[in-house]
Amino acid sequence: SWLDNHVKIMRPDNGEIVESFEGLNLPVSATKYNDQIAVALHGNKSVMLLNPGTGEREILADGFQAPTHVINYREDLVVSDRSKGEVIRIDVNGNKEVLIDGLDSPEGLAYKDNALYIFEGNTGDIKKFQNNQISVIASVMPGSNALSELQPPSVILNGLAIKGDYLYISGELERSL
């Protein structure tokens, strides 16, 4: 949570917090990556790897303006940079490659069957990126901007998730899923 600068690992069956990483600089998104946890840090403008076994921390990639959501993408990671309007691939060595640019405030990301889905926070557009082509597949109510530059770009992440054949869209202002 960016409010308390923690990333917590929780057992979903009973809600037990099994590990907590404290003192992070505005963590806004996290995902399991190999044997570690990848975290998008708005305050550091970076993606950090946390090792649950040892507690070690390592910056994997930096130089972002507003890293917003990090997910697994094939064997790598992708992160949305809301301010730059980019989706960036990060390999295991921290090398970055811009996959998509020219977006309007990319926030939530989801990946399935060689397609990457992107929620544009300012427009409400849900975009699909596949075979180097991008298309709008849906539009919902856009999100809101942060109240100050010290806060992450989106106070509430406009997120995406895929389960089975369905894409789930969390709408901040609509308060819907």
Positions of the model-derived regions?
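Sequence-structural signature of mature extracellular/luminal beta-sheet repeat domains
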Residues: 1-177
